[in-house]
Amino acid sequence: MPIDPLDVAILNALQVDGRASLRRVARTVGASVTTVSTRVRGLERLGVLQGFVPLLSVQRLAAMGRSPHCVALFVRPSSSAREGIERAARAVAREPAVCYLFQLAGTSELLALASTRSERETAALVRSLQDLTPVARVRTIPIHRVHKERPNHPVGPALAAVPELGA
């Protein structure tokens, strides 16, 4: 099922308010509730929509003395071959504290953003990552302050050739 302009409009509406009712999303995008419901289920089946979760404000939690310990982790795989990078990425992605995991362009290095309850938990996470066979090195940079946190992802134009997931 290709993603069309209506799907993009639905995704954008849900990124603005993931708790919006299907009726409100339908009004926003100019479609029927039935159509929006069908499209949302289709986007879930495709894995484009992976659930609806609350966004916690690190800034507000910090103001209440409950700030999570956020850290950027630069992970160097043991092998710079494609398979080695994929093995390292799969291993790092299994860690529950890792919120985001990216492969950086022009390098075999991975960038992980993680969130733990304390520096002690972060240190344990780093040790755990360093003990993974497909990981050669982990470099950490603690995040001092969060100025913006909003994981809005614009949906780009259709590509002529879509790469396969995991390829």
Q: Where in the sequence are the language-model features?
A:
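A compositional/biophysical signature of low hydrophobicity enriched in polar/charged and small residues
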Residues: M1-A167
